[in-house]
Amino acid sequence: EIAAWMSVSEQQDHALVSVVRLMAEANQATVYVRLRGLKPDAVYLEEQSGRQYSGAALMHAGIPLPPFTREYEAYQFAFTELKEAGTLYEKVQKWCDRNAKNRVVISLYGGSGSGKTTLATALQQYFLNDGTGCYLLSGDDYPHRIPKRNDEERMRVYKETGEDGLRGYLGTKKEIDFDRINEVLAAFHEGKDTITLRHMGREDGEISSEETDFSGISVLLLEWTHGGSDDLHGVDLPVFLESSPEE
């Protein structure tokens, strides 16, 4: 048994949910708490976990509570509407309406901390909410080396050639396998239903390829720092995300 209460802002853009578990049983099934008063079509960020939910999902399915450890556990969840994602989706949708294509590649790029991952995930949810098949692809799987080895290579280049040499390495074909990711975008535009994607881990040997089903997918979202590079081909709509150091 649980007791739960919530408050929602007048604009329906913020919600705070408090839950107390009154009774707990061994091997208890996952408990969901359904919210009320949200915008069904909006996407909300749960601030502590960083997970995203549509308003409809929060109101109809609810948010799962963590596995219990004792009775009278208390939880609190804070939700914030991702308004920037909604605004971006409206603009992207207008562009798509003006440029009718069977398949569209949208690149979201910007510096570290600019919100690429958060916005891309929310944008994907907006497309899915409208019944549009959308796949989110991370460009972080396409350097030549795993992160640890790439950091070592950056240091080697800097020690041997200084800042000029490092500028000639970062984000270029020397660091990034642009040919590989360009093949992915080309295959998507060609209408292929199965495309080989690359997956990169953090340790030696953790680079693999996987056949991925793209049937029913009409929008490919590419989220990547280098998504605006001249060496990247096949992007229909580039979206640059600008952020200040404070942000």
Give the location of each predicted region.
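Carbohydrate-binding surface patches
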Residues: 2-39
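C-terminal beta-strand-rich structural cap/linker in extracellular carbohydrate-active enzymes
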Residues: 56-82
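Walker A (P-loop) phosphate-binding loop of P-loop NTPases
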Residues: 113
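Conserved lysine of the Walker
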Residues: 116
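Hydrophobic positions on the alpha1 helix immediately C-terminal to the Walker A/P-loop
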Residues: 119
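ATP-dependent NMP and nucleoside kinases share a basic, alpha-helical "lid"
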Residues: 206-247
